[in-house]
Structures are given as structure tokens and as C-alpha cells.
């Protein structure tokens, strides 16, 4: 955790209430926070009679590492369990979330599983943009086929809630092998597949929820942090943005000239967004504004690329 004082109590408490597990430990690393993160986490750990919760202070970030990757790598070295559960501080899980996820993992004979939490949006911008990631998965990937594949290009993951078999994680190299990758969740899933380990994203909306941002400024900063890398390189971003424009914005632009064609394509994209929202219990009321959301997403992609090229991207006080 880095400067997560508002999330410390909720994160640790929801994790500590897990049932259906024979044994578990909660490891918290304070990544050189400048707020009360360590104090709050340490106080919670000391208030528990058992040694379930352990709090560590992170050291200086080594050269070549990104902060989150080094923190997770450090925690993985301290962990003693058969499974590693990586959980963002802003995620809240219900009491059976981990046991249910592990059961699904075992039933499919996977090495990792990534339950996608229900996204809680605060404000218009978050409700407009946040559902796009889930929609992009469901509209461009056949997840049932992707989860059976070992092709790294079909891997999808969400680092908010990620469970992996500890032995397989270490065999593939773990976060040390992706120490400088800003999209650590996706790169870890690709790394697992390169090592012939299967896994997938699953709908986690019934067992977990996440409020990533509290205002529009945080959302913009969060998207800026990673979108420059989301599609491989600038050419990939241009190609994806062009496809998004053609499929989601162009139908609206041609309505005055080719009303029926434009309306048909708009309704198709609208229904795909609604179908995803219903399936994942995500935000529905912004679905009619999908073209606006896509326009904003394209803007954020190229804003991220621009700022990365200027070397002016920062996250939690560290340059990316």
C-alpha cells in the first residue's frame, strides 16, 4: 500500500473475514507512504490476537522496478501459502470470495484466476468510462475460447483481485520477470501462459467490489498511467482507436445522411454494452452514451502517450 490511509481498515477487515479456508495469512506492505498507512495497518495487526496479519515496511525502490511490482515481489517472498492472492487496497471482498475463486480455479485446472470486481463509480466521468474495460473484453474476446488457449496474445487479467498457485508463480518468474511493466496484471497472465499455465478472468461482481477513484482527476491520472502501454505501442493504439471510432462513433456521425444504417450500427453497439452490463452487474445508465465514452477513452489513450513521450507521467509521486 502506498498512501492508502482511506482504504487500510476496509481492505484488511474484509480480507480477515474469509471463510472456507483451512489457513491463511494477510501480508501488508507499506510502500514508503507519506500518510498514516503504516500506522493504521500496524495498529490493526496488533489488535488481532493471532499472527494472521503481518505488516512490512518497504525499502528503497531498486533501479529498473516499478513500485507496485516490487511491492508484490517482496510480499511473495514472505508468503508461505499454496496460493498467492494479490488484492488492491480499494477492493472489498465478501467472506467466501477467496474460497469460491480457488474452487473455480481447481475445477478448471487453472494456475491462476482473476475475478473482476464490480466497479463502483463516483461521479459522471467514472460511470461513463469505467465499464469500458469489461465491455472491451466481452465484445472482442470469446472468453471461453481464450481461457483454454495458451497464446499470450489472448490473455486477459485484472490486478485488482488476482489469485495464483504459488509454485507456478515462482516457476514462471513472478513479478521479477515483469518488474518494469506498468500493466503488471496483463503481463503476469501472459508470462503464465508462456510457461504453459492456464487461467482466465471471471466475473467477480458477486464476490468483490472496487471503487478505484473518488473524483475525475484521480480517474484521468489512473488512465494516463497505463494507457500508453495498453495496446503494445503507438501503432497499436492508433489501430485500436481507429476501430473504436469506426464501430462506436462513426455510426452517430452518419445519422443525418444515412439514418437507418447509422441507427442499426448504433443499436448493435448499444446492445453489446447493455448485455455486458447486465452480465457483470455493472453500470447500465451510461450505455446510451457509449459513443461519448469511447471518444473520451480515445482522448485518454493519446493523452497518456503524449505525456509518456514527454516523460511527465507520475503515479503516487513516482515517475513512470
Predicted regions and their residues:
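Short, acidic, metal-binding catalytic loop of nucleotide-sugar glycosyltransferases
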Residues: 13-23
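A conserved acidic beta->alpha catalytic loop
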Residues: 30-40, 60
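Long helical/loop segments within the catalytic core of UDP-sugar-dependent glycosyltransferases
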Residues: 55-74, 100-163, 167-171, 286-297, ...
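Catalytic donor/gating beta->alpha subdomain of glycosyltransferases that bind UDP-sugars
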Residues: 105-108, 112-137, 167-170, 175-237
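Short acidic donor-binding loop at the edge of a beta-strand
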Residues: 80-83
Amino acid at each position: 500500500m502506498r498512501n492508502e490511509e482511506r482504504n487500510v481498515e476496509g481492505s484488511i477487515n474484509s480480507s480477515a473475514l474469509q471463510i472456507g479456508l483451512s489457513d491463511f495469512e494477510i501480508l501488508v506492505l507499506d510502500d514508503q507512504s507519506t500518510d498514516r498507512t503504516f500506522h493504521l495497518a500496524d495498529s490493526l495487526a496488533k489488535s488481532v490476537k493471532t499472527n494472521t496479519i503481518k505488516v512490512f515496511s518497504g525499502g528503497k525502490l531498486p533501479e529498473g522496478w516499478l513500485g507496485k511490482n516490487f511491492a508484490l515481489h517482496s510480499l511473495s517472498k514472505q508468503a508461505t501459502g499454496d496460493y498467492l492472492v494479490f488484492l488492491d487496497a480499494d477492493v472489498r471482498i465478501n467472506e467466501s470470495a477467496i474460497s469460491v475463486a480457488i474452487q473455480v480455479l481447481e475445477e478448471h485446472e487453472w494456475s491462476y484466476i482473476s475475478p473482476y470486481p464490480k466497479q463502483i463509480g463516483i461521479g459522471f466521468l467514472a460511470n461513463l468510462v469505467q465499464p469500458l474495460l469489461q465491455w472491451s473484453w466481452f465484445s472482442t474476446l470469446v472468453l471461453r475460447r481464450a481461457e483454454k488457449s495458451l497464446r499470450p496474445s489472448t490473455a486477459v487479467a485484472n490486478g485488482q483481485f488476482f489469485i495464483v498457485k504459488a509454485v507456478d508463480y515462482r516457476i514462471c518468474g513472478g513479478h521479477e520477470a515483469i518488474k518494469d511493466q506498468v500493466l503488471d496484471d496483463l503481463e503476469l497472465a501472459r508470462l503464465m501462459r508462456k510457461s504453459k499455465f492456464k487461467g482466465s478472468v471471471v466475473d467477480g461482481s458477486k464476490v468483490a467490489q472496487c471503487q478505484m477513484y473518488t473524483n475525475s482527476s484521480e480517474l484521468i491520472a489512473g488512465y494516463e498511467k497505463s494507457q500508453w502501454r495498453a495496446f503494445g505501442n503507438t501503432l497499436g493504439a492508433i489501430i485500436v482507436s481507429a476501430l473504436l471510432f469506426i464501430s462506436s462513433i462513426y455510426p452517430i456521425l452518419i445519422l443525418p445522411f444515412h439514418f437507418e444504417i447509422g441507427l442499426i450500427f448504433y443499436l448493435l453497439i448499444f446492445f453489446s454494452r447493455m448485455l455486458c452490463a447486465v452480465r457483470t452487474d455493472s453500470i447500465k445508465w451510461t450505455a446510451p452514451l457509449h459513443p461519448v465514452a469511447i471518444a473520451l477513452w480515445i482522448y485518454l489513450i493519446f493523452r497518456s502517450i503524449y505525456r509518456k513521450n514527454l516523460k511527465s507521467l507520475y503515479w503516487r509521486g513516482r515517475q513512470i
